[in-house]
Amino acid sequence: DHLVPTARELAFNLRDFGSDGAYGHYFNGPSTFDISNDEFVVLELERLKAMPDLFNVVVMVVINAVTQELYLSARDRPRFVLCDEAAQFMTREEGQDLSRLAEAISQGYRRARKYRGSFGIILQSMNDLLLFGGTGQVILENAATRFLLQGSTYDKAVENKILDYSGFVLDLLKSVRNNKPNYSE
């Protein structure tokens, strides 16, 4: 008897994802989402920002796929997971649950090497790591490599203790210039 109200609530919450629901065409039928043969995966979620219900579900699907591939598959080849413009997804918007994404990034940075994998994020500024809360600290402590391009906020990143550069190294970093349309320094 106690399961009936729970089942009704579950059915109500899933109605938009059923065959006739607003998002049904994304989830009904054979799945075409397969990253098992991909060595390089970019999580590009920009189009979903305006649809928080769909955003949360797709993030769960992607996290599940990445987890399966990275942690549970054979370790015979390396894997690389890159989250582009990651900071925009760490800024909560109406209805978005970012805890799963933050946890996946955090666990990825902590555990991926053990499974011949690596995790990366692309940010506009090192200071964007402050948006990540505790996950930002995990990223700082576990990122083996950083690619730092031209930026105007490196002094602020030093003040925020995100970067520990000073003197010549900081001056050298601040001297990096973009040389469009060619490759940069």
Give each language-model segment a name.
Residues 93, 97-102, 106-185:
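Conserved ATP-driven motor cores of ASCE-family P-loop NTPases powering translocation/secretion/packaging/pilus
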